Amino acid sequence: MNDCSRCAGSTSSGPAHWSGRIRDIADFPKPGIVFKDITPLLSDGPDFASALDEMAQPWRTTPLDAVLGIEARGFILGAALARELRTGFVPVRKPGKLPGRTLIQEYALEYGTDRIEMHEDALPRGARVLIVDDVLATGGTLRAALGLAAQLELEIVGAAVLVELLALQGRSKWLNDVPLLATLSY
């Protein structure tokens, strides 16, 4: 018999339990950064499923046309949430990764800038979208996704993140009148 507490058939007990599945990786991706690694949570089927259910719950009765999932781990969560919510999925990617014509949004990093993009014909004007990412840190990437959505004149119904790093105050870059929900906060 397989003795695997992380395998199918194990039980989870909610956010306090899921926090134990997220590990800190020091000095990644560069010195001085403590990276929140969600991959142990993703590799545990029951925990991943229950965390997704928790993320989806507030949006189940919200009319949506699509989930915008931010590269890279926002793809994993966003696509799974789109399926759970029975709606479409639109990838928001790093430059040069999407074929065809794209819209580009630049955003500030700690040292320099970066860009994200999405197809210019991804959704019709006025489509209702939920933005999904794995971690809310400084808020730059989420804010850039807002910029892309604004270029397409999409209606943002909210954002969902698995983890929010409170000390970095990324929430301050979000829209005050649009819900931003974090499943776990550190």
Curated annotation (Swiss-Prot):
- EC nos: 2.4.2.7
Can the keyword Transferase be found in this entry's annotation?
yes
**Which pathway does it take part in?**
Purine metabolism; AMP biosynthesis via salvage pathway; AMP from adenine: step 1/1
- Could you tell me where this protein is found in the cell? Cytoplasm
What is the catalytic activity of this protein? AMP + diphosphate = 5-phospho-alpha-D-ribose 1-diphosphate + adenine
- GO-annotated biological processes: adenine salvage; AMP salvage; purine ribonucleoside salvage
A Pfam family per the record = Pribosyltran
The GO terms this record gives for MF are: adenine binding; adenine phosphoribosyltransferase activity; AMP binding
Can you supply one Gene Ontology CC term for this chain's record? Answer: cytoplasm
The UniProt keywords, alphabetically, are: Cytoplasm, Glycosyltransferase, Purine salvage, Transferase
Location, primary (coarse class): cytoplasm
Q: What family is reported?
A: Belongs to the purine/pyrimidine phosphoribosyltransferase family.
Protein name per its UniProtKB record = Adenine phosphoribosyltransferase
Q: Which organism is it from?
A: Xanthomonas campestris pv. campestris (strain ATCC 33913 / DSM 3586 / NCPPB 528 / LMG 568 / P 25)
